[in-house]
Amino acid sequence: YDSTNLLPAKAVVVTSVGMDHMRLLGNTIEEIADAISAAFRPHAVAVIGKTDPAAMNILEVNARRKKATVYRYGRDFWYDGKFLSYSGSLDFQLALRGVHQWYNASAAIQTVLALSSTELNNIDASDIQEGLREAFWPGRMETVRENPLIILDGAHNPHAAQSLRTSLDLLYPGKKWNIFFAAMKDKDWRSVLTQFLDLANHVYVVRMPYERAESPETIVEFLKEKGTSSSVCEEQDVIKCDEDALVFGSLYLVGDVRRLTRNAVHSF
């Protein structure tokens, strides 16, 4: 059983598998991949993106049990400056920022190509390129203010945090940030936050108006043990920051800050 099966689908795409929603899915990558496999449909297309090799193996085995047509990253398609597969290649520009988004885009291209002979026969290469140029995902490496800079990212588990860190190192090498962070109690926020401590000028732990939110004092105490400068702040303090800021750790936080920045712009 999987809740995604409530909707009909000609294709199912798994972009990556990480340690999240473990209360529902399992406590290991293998268990989570096995649970996610319930989303695959019989005799449909199954696209497996770039992720943990053990997870990829489990996903493929389960997809084939359902007689799905499987396309696997690194074997059937891949990304190396452009989309590549045994049937051809495609150059594309991507509006979404973040190294992992290039791999996700490649999985999306493979899905369209797999369906092009039946469901999507009116879509050509230029349509795909235009779609990727215009693709937008709020709260994913999103710049909501340019000067000083505010970047929002929904990373709230170790896997997503690693993707964010890789992207920051590539796009802003050596840059230090004022970090605004909050997390839910049921998330592995210590592993998330630890990946960014060497990038922090200061960590502002944002007090969140949600019952599930971790106590900011608990997070500050953890940072104190790590020797990292930190303090508690309110959500409104993010947009008052007069230096470059990085906001992550909770989708609730990202959503609230995004609304605050939009309201600040519209108030002028």
Residue ranges: model-predicted function:
Residues 76-90:
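Acidic-glycine-rich active-site phosphate/pyrophosphate-binding loop
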Residues 49-51, 62-80, 95-99, 125-135, ...:
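Beta-strand->loop->alpha-helix junctions that form or flank phosphate-binding loops
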Residues 3-6, 17, 21-24, 204-222, ...:
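Flexible, gly/pro- and Lys/Arg-enriched active-site loops
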Residues 49-69, 80-82, 149-150, 158, ...:
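C-terminal helical cap/extension that packs against the catalytic core
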Residues 1, 6-66, 189:
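Conserved catalytic-core segment of NTP-binding enzymes
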Residues 45, 149, 176-180, 243-246, ...:
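Residue-level preference for the first positions of well-ordered beta-strands
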Residues 1-13, 17-22, 31, 88-202:
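Nucleotide phosphate-binding/pyrophosphate-handling subdomain across enzymes
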Residues 238-262:
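A glycine-rich beta-strand to alpha-helix segment
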